[in-house]
Regions:
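Cap/lid segment of the alpha/beta-hydrolase catalytic domain
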Residues: 122, 129-224, 234-235, 280-283
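N-terminal cap/lid segment of alpha/beta-hydrolase-fold proteins
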Residues: 70-122, 126-128
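Mobile cap/lid helix-loop segments that gate and shape the active-site cleft of serine hydrolases
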Residues: 206, 210-213, 228, 268-311, ...
Length: 382
């Protein structure tokens, strides 16, 4: 016993010594460089609408969109013969059918997905519902659509627990009950696109870094997949391809406005709780320990455009942004600054009424009322 205690004490001493190792001089603190303010001051966003010397809005959109794609690095190669889907399972729900699919979105891989199709005669309007991050990678599509009966009981239980963040209501099922075809896919590293060793948040950044060694960007692959999945959605016979929207909250909101900016199929979008400016996101003043990360990182893009400038590429798309006044991830000062930039863009094109921005008295969340507001917006614009 004494020998075991001695070994344990030695191990603890070693661990504490390693954790406590510090030098008098350093260059990084709280995961940011000490010269972060200087980096921010050097960001002038020369390609932003109003900063760029391009004065024709259509020409600017094409140039800005191409710059985003350039910074996203190469896309995954499209599958030969177009997108193909295999139906894995189907079940009837209250007013709509639910299917589990495997969609060949790339020559490299298939993407697991759920699709919900309302009963009755189509074609129907459709919404690509994009799941969040939540530092929880075990489930993806199951965060926004109730798992089908073919899934493991652990997946079903986990999804039901996660739905508590939506006040017990699955966002996708809610839209399907109200007449929309709904698609939800797993993003890379989530759900059935995760690690063989199991879902571990601490491995995400390491894998993203490894992917960059292949000359590709994992965050970009997520966006490329969202674009491809929307193209697949538009090809479904049950879908009116002229009436497609997208929505999501947290990382799903980021995915939604990125998709609206980069895909002409999107006619309306509702991002909930993800919009800010880089000067507020990457600042020391909010005492955060995580400021962004690989989930929304395209190399070099910030030298040209900030988040609201990228979202502005979507104009004149109808968009409703909802953020929370109590959201500690997205401080109101940065949110409002971003909203103001976007409003200037929509108003410059005479379509100011097609951009709605709201700050609610809520934390980082997507309650039933936000889902109801999104449904109302989609009914109006799709």
């Amino acid at each position: 016993m004494i020998r075991k205690l001695t070994i344990l004490a030695a191990c603890l001493t070693t661990v504490l010594a390693i954790c406590a190792q510090k030098r008098d001089k350093y260059e990084f603190k709280r995961n940011l460089p000490v010269y972060a303010d200087s980096l921010i001051a050097d960001l002038t966003y020369p390609l932003a609408w109003g900063n760029s010397d391009i004065t024709d809005f259509g020409e600017w959109k094409r140039a800005a969109r191409q710059k985003v794609f350039d910074c996203m690095l190469p896309p995954p190669p499209r599958p030969e013969g177009g997108y193909k889907a295999k139906v894995i399972f189907e079940e009837q729900r209250d007013g709509y059918k639910a299917r589990k699919l495997e969609i060949q979105l790339s020559r490299y891989y298939t993407v697991p997905a759920y699709v919900l199709i309302p009963d009755g005669k189509g074609p129907f309007p459709a919404v690509n519902v994009l799941h969040d991050h939540g530092a929880h990678l075990f489930i993806g599509k199951e965060k926004v659509i109730s798992p089908l009966a073919c899934e493991d009981s652990t997946v079903i239980r986990d999804a039901n627990e996660w739905a508590a963040g939506y006040e017990g209501q699955f966002y996708g099922d809610y839209l399907a009950k109200n007449g929309f075809v709904v698609l939800a896919t797993d993003a890379p590293m989530w759900g059935e696109r995760g690690q063989m060793e199991g879902a571990r948040r601490d491995r995400y950044d390491m894998i993203a870094g490894n992917m960059m060694m292949y000359g590709i960007d994992m965050s970009a692959y997520m966006t490329y997949d969202d674009i491809a999945a929307t193209e697949f959605l538009a090809s479904m016979p049950e879908v009116d391809k002229g009436r497609i929207g997208c929505t999501g909250w947290s990382m799903g909101a980021y995915r939604a406005w990125m998709l609206a900016a980069l895909s002409d199929y999107i006619k309306a979008a509702v991002p909930v709780c993800w919009m800010i400016t880089t000067d507020e996101q990457m600042s020391f003043k909010y005492q955060r320990t995580e400021n962004g990360g690989f989930a929304n990182c395209f190399p070099g893009l910030r030298r040209w455009l900030d988040y609201p400038h990228i979202a502005s590429i979507a104009c004149p798309c109808a968009m409703l942004f909802i953020n929370g006044a109590q959201d500690k991830l997205f401080p109101v000062a940065g949110v409002q600054k971003a909203f103001d930039i976007m409003h200037q863009t929509w108003e410059s094109q005479g379509v100011g009424d097609r951009l709605v921005t709201e700050i609610w008295d809520m934390p980082h969340s997507c309650p039933r009322e936000a889902q109801r507001r999104a449904l109302e917006f989609f009914k109006k614009h799709l």
